[in-house]
Design a protein with these regions (language model features):
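Conserved P-loop
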Residues: 4-73
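A short beta-strand-to-loop transition that corresponds to the Sensor-1 phosphate-sensing loop
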Residues: 34, 83-84, 136-139
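Short, structured coil/loop segments at alpha-helix boundaries
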Residues: 38-45, 53, 76, 104-109, ...
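Helix-adjacent hinge/juxtasegments
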Residues: 55-112
Length: 151
C-alpha cells in the first residue's frame, strides 16, 4: 500500500506516534534496528516493548531487512521499522570502527552504498507488500551544527 515516514528530534515521541498509527491494524510487525549494547539502550528497548504490549511480532535486524520483511509479509497488515537512524549507525560502525576524525576517503562511499542498498531493499519490498510500512527516523539536520563528525 504505502510508506509512512515519521521523523523528529531524538526522544520526541516518534516511536509512540508511529505505534499509534500501527495500532489501527490488527497484525503488526515491529522491526527493531537497534543493537542494545549498553544499559541505557537495553532500558530503552525494554520501555518500548512494554509500551507496545505483547500483540506484536518483533524482529531484530539492521541489515538484510528485505529477508526479515519477507518472512512476515503474508501474516501482517503493517510493519513498523524503528529506526532508520539506528540502522545507519550500526552499518557505519560495522564498516568502520576507527577514528572518525580521520576517516579514510573510501569509507563514506562504502557506508553510503551499503545504506542505500538496504533502503532500496525496503523500497523494493514495498512494491509487493499489501500493507503499510511505517519508517521512523531521527531528524538530525535542523538543530545546531555538531562539533564532531559523528554529531
Amino acid at each position: 500500500m504505502g510508506i509512512i515516514y515519521v521523523t523528529g528530534g531524538a526522544k520526541s515521541g516518534k516511536s509512540k506516534f508511529a505505534e499509534s498509527l500501527a495500532f489501527k491494524s490488527e497484525k503488526r510487525v515491529y522491526l527493531a534496528t537497534s543493537l542494545p549494547l549498553d544499559s541505557e539502550m537495553r532500558d530503552r528497548v525494554a520501555r518500548h516493548r512494554e509500551q507496545r504490549g505483547r500483540d506484536w511480532i518483533t524482529i531484530e535486524a539492521y541489515k538484510n531487512l528485505d529477508e526479515a520483511l519477507k518472512r512476515t509479509a503474508d501474516n501482517t497488515d503493517v510493519i513498523l521499522l524503528d529506526c532508520l537512524t539506528n540502522m545507519i549507525s550500526n552499518i557505519m560502525f560495522e564498516i568502520y570502527d576507527g577514528n572518525w576524525e580521520s576517516v579514510p576517503d573510501y569509507i563514506p562511499e562504502k557506508i553510503t552504498g551499503t545504506v542505500l542498498a538496504e533502503i532500496n531493499k525496503v523500497l523494493d519490498f514495498n512494491k509487493i507488500y499489501k500493507g503499510n510500512i511505517i519508517i521512523v527516523s531521527n531528524e538530525v539536520g535542523m538543530g545546531l551544527v555538531p562539533e564532531y563528525p559523528l554529531g
